[in-house]
Structures are given as structure tokens and as C-alpha cells.
Amino acid sequence: MQVILLDKIGNLGSLGDTVNVKSGYARNFLIPQGKAVMATKGNVEMFEARRAELEAKVAEQLASAEARAEKVNALEAVVIASKAGDEGKLFGSIGTRDIADAITAAGVEVVKSEVRLPEGALRTTGEFEISVQLHSEVFATVKLQVVAE
């Protein structure tokens, strides 16, 4: 299925690219989230008419993400207290929602889908470097300290 991208999508393309994707991916993800439209003649003409407006919107989103990244990078260590055993093993785990809530409480608005935990949830106490993806091109890192209550 041919679609026109309205946003930069990793491993697919950037704004204005016409790409061929599987129909389920287009119908269930790209089109409902407003990241693409079907590549019909009418949509191609409409896109070309709105191209400058869409490019300005994408540039504005990128600028706001970069400003948020500076705030996240400026944070000192974010501390999360959790119940833990004698050897520093947590009762339960700390996931993306807990980290996003802690960063938001520290003063920078972050949602859980922006927090990246490649090794999965944190299950021990200690210091961790957490990556936050605020935009497809903008990453920030924050130091996270997990301490026992």
C-alpha cells in the first residue's frame, strides 16, 4: 500500500516521502495516528498544498523537543525510593511509568512512551543512565538513583 508520510518515521522515511508499506501497518498504525495518508491523487495534491504548513509544524515540534531535552539534561539525579531487600534487590520493579512520573515531579513533563529501557524494568538499587526519546531525532539522558526505603 502506498502512503505519504506526514511525519518522520524511523526506518521508513521523512515528511513527504511516498513509501510502500504493508496494508495492516498503514490501516492500523500510520493512518489512525495521523502519521500518514493514503497516496491517492487527491491526497497528493492536498499534501503539496499543505506542505509548508506541515513542515513548519514538524520544525516547531522539533524545537520544543530540543528545549525539553535541555531541561532533562540539566536535571541533577532523579531519585526514586522503593522497597528493597538486604542485597539491594527490589520488591517489584521500576518501569517506564515510574521513571516518567519521577521526571515529571522533578519539573519536566515526560510521558512513559518517551522513556527507553532497553534492558527492561529496573530490579536493583543503584545509579542508572536512562535515555529519554523526546522526538524521533531528539534524545536526552537523565541520571536515576534507585534507593531503598
UniProtKB/Swiss-Prot annotation:
<dbReference type="InterPro" id="IPR000244">
    <property type="entry name" value="Ribosomal_bL9"/>
</dbReference>
<comment type="function">
    <text>Binds to the 23S rRNA.</text>
</comment>
<dbReference type="InterPro" id="IPR020069">
    <property type="entry name" value="Ribosomal_bL9_C"/>
</dbReference>
<dbReference type="InterPro" id="IPR036935">
    <property type="entry name" value="Ribosomal_bL9_N_sf"/>
</dbReference>
<keyword id="KW-0687">Ribonucleoprotein</keyword>
<dbReference type="Pfam" id="PF03948">
    <property type="entry name" value="Ribosomal_L9_C"/>
</dbReference>
<dbReference type="GO" id="GO:1990904">
    <property type="term" value="C:ribonucleoprotein complex"/>
</dbReference>
<dbReference type="GO" id="GO:0006412">
    <property type="term" value="P:translation"/>
</dbReference>
<keyword id="KW-0699">rRNA-binding</keyword>
<comment type="similarity">
    <text>Belongs to the bacterial ribosomal protein bL9 family.</text>
</comment>
<protein>
    <recommendedName>
        <fullName>Large ribosomal subunit protein bL9</fullName>
    </recommendedName>
</protein>
<dbReference type="GO" id="GO:0003735">
    <property type="term" value="F:structural constituent of ribosome"/>
</dbReference>
<dbReference type="Pfam" id="PF01281">
    <property type="entry name" value="Ribosomal_L9_N"/>
</dbReference>
<dbReference type="InterPro" id="IPR036791">
    <property type="entry name" value="Ribosomal_bL9_C_sf"/>
</dbReference>
<dbReference type="GO" id="GO:0005840">
    <property type="term" value="C:ribosome"/>
</dbReference>
<keyword id="KW-0694">RNA-binding</keyword>
<keyword id="KW-0689">Ribosomal protein</keyword>
<dbReference type="GO" id="GO:0019843">
    <property type="term" value="F:rRNA binding"/>
</dbReference>
<dbReference type="InterPro" id="IPR020070">
    <property type="entry name" value="Ribosomal_bL9_N"/>
</dbReference>
<dbReference type="InterPro" id="IPR020594">
    <property type="entry name" value="Ribosomal_bL9_bac/chp"/>
</dbReference>
<dbReference type="InterPro" id="IPR009027">
    <property type="entry name" value="Ribosomal_bL9/RNase_H1_N"/>
</dbReference>
